[in-house]
Structures are given as C-alpha cells and as structure tokens.
C-alpha cells in the first residue's frame, strides 16, 4: 500500500482540497476508495482555461468547450448530495447561461457558503433568484467583463449569513438604492462595488456591521448628497464625483481611507478661480462641503488622497480638521493637479511618521504654499519644519531637475526626517529608463545621492521601480 493510501481519510481529503478540482478528480481513477473520498472534497474550483488554453485557438476546436461543461456536470454528479464549502467558477462566453445557473442552483442546494464567479456570459445575463435566498451563503464574489445587473431588488432577498459581497464589472447595476440593499444583509462586514451605477443622486450607506467599504461609482454628474452611517468601518476606499453635500459621515473607528473624489477639468479651473466669480447656481459653490467628509474620517490612521481630491480640498483649507491619528499619508500627484492642500495637511497631521508620494510632479499654482519650492516665498518650508514625519518615500522619480530641487527642498526642511526612499520610474521604453542607461547620467544621479547622504543626517536610498499608477 502506498504512503498516501495509508493516511486517514480526513488527512487525504485535506490534501485533495489543496489541489485544483481537475487534479483532484483525476485521483478517482486510482481506486474506489479514492473515488469515494473525492466525493467528500468540500472545495470545487472550475476554470475553463485549464481546458481551453494555453494553445491559441484551442477554444474554437470542436468539443473542447463541451468537454469543460461535461466535466463540471460529472463532478457535481459524482459528489451526489455532499456538502460544499466553496464553489469557484471561471468561464468565458460560450457556456449557456441556463447551464451556469443550473450549476449554481445545485451547489446552493448543497449548503455552499462561499461562491466566487468570474463569468463573461454577455449582456442580458441574470443570476438565478435562488442565489438571493440562501440560508448558508457567507461570501459572494462576482466578476464580469460585461455589465452586471446583479441584484433583482430587496423584495424576495434574504441572505442572513452573508458577510462579504464583492461585485466587479464594466458597469454594475442595482434595482434599488443602497439603503434598500444593505438591510437585506444583516451581518454584512465587507462590501466592494466596482463601477457601480448609482440609482439616485441622493444616497445613504447605512450599516452597523460593515468594516470594509470599497466603492467606485459611475455617474455623469455630481450627486446632490452622499451620507455614510457606518460607525464600525475600518477600511474605506471611495471613488466618485464629488457630491454637493455630505450631510452625515459616521466613521469613528476608521483605520484606512483612500479618497478619489472626481471633478472635470472645467470644474477644477473654477475651483482655482475667485469664488465671487461663480454663478449662483454653479455646483462648484458647494464643493466646500467636502470638509464634512473629512470631518467624518478624521480619526483615520492611514490616509490616501488622489490628485483631484487634493485640488478639491483646497476650497476648505481654513476649516480642515486635525488628523490626530494619521501616521501614514499617501499623496498621488498629477502634472495637471495642484498641491494647494498639501501644506495644511502636513500641519494638521501632528503624529505623521511616513509620507509617501506617488510622483511629485504637480500643477504649479500660487497657492501651493511652502510644501514645494516651485514659487519663491519668504515663509519657505514652514509647514515642513513643523511636520514630525520620519520617513519619506517618493515613487516614480523621473530624474528631472525640477524633481531633484523638490527632493532637496524636502531634505532641507523636514527637520525630523530620518530616511528617504526614492524609486526611479523604470517603465519599459520610458524616457527615464533611456536616460538611466546613459552611464554618465546614471553615475551623476548616484553621485548626487551620495552627496545627499554626506550633507544631510537623513539616510537617502535610491531604488528601481515600476511606473507609478494613479487611481482613477
């Protein structure tokens, strides 16, 4: 008897659970004992790429797609009515939607707790109604390269055990507002919605159980109001057009927040101009209410701000709250967006330890303050001197004189700085990479870094990295 066959059934079943379903199913040919054991494997993972790839054009061969569907049918049949813990399905267009729904209904009848679907079945596909009345479902993840009209509405929905809901699509639709959706999931802890089409211009996200909320909204205009009543939230990632108002923001226990508030170029232009030039009905007049959102997240420990967000915060610098708990601040920069809010952010984070820049090239305005050296001013470096930051990390360094001057500005005025990490932008075929291939230039850059270490008490390190990516 081989070593594996001599192991207890519980151990062999555990081993099978770490294999793909295709690999696990192949053990059933060894003996009847292995076949019976496979029927008890609680995790099923079906991926059509194992049948249809990597050979180019293999999908089009007669019978290949059919063999995948037959394999899923055989496995489900072989397992009989045994319980399923996790069901993962990845399949592209070509599998009939009715067949996919039949598989889903079968695993739902077998008390599945975790469903992970990556299904590109084309437009007009609807998930089975049975998926929304499960008494055992705990985790549900949906992903598609098409639009997802994923939820039929609050009426008839009952998922009392659901703790994690993640939906990713080109465009995600809901037939009801979020305030109607969330009560259907009374113990939900994680909600992630990518490219969600908001149903209304006034929305409220209210849940006492949510700890993770990641939303990317899609709309053509600024919403009237968005409220968040989520007192136990720990992680908040929010991308959407800036709202005219944030009446309620309750996030007292927040650990991480990343804000990507959007505004179009014309709105940004008006934000930079005098407020008395704005027309009475101009939506930009209400952008100052973004301070209500900042007040609601002021207990956060790690804060990420994207380029548009920085510009929008410039309209509420005078009323910006103090972030007493922020120890890590990450700033995404863009050459078309300004740093007007950076000085007040540095002053209002009295316990800041780590400051990360995803790029330091930004739009220069006369309101950038003393955070940069783009414009000469008498109070140069004031906000930097009072900042307690110990570590500065700069990603996407393009080896330009403008960037080097700004790095020296940081070294001159961050009085508590102990370490600076600089990551060169090394995008393939990029200008920076071509420059660094020049031995004389690369030697000059390295020599400058050595001079920094000799002249400043701060430890300056130079690394290579991929091109910075700015969240949209």
From Swiss-Prot:
InterPro entries, per the entry: F-box-like_dom_sf (IPR036047), F-box_AtFBL13-like (IPR053781), F-box_dom (IPR001810), FBD (IPR006566), FBL60-like (IPR055294), LRR_dom_sf (IPR032675), LRR_FXL15/At3g58940/PEG3-like (IPR055411)
GO annotation, biological process: defense response
Gene3D superfamilies, sorted: 1.20.1280.50, Ribonuclease Inhibitor
Domain called F-box: residue spans: 1-49
Name of this protein: F-box protein At3g03040
Organism: Arabidopsis thaliana (Mouse-ear cress)
Lineage: Eukaryota, Viridiplantae, Streptophyta, Embryophyta, Tracheophyta
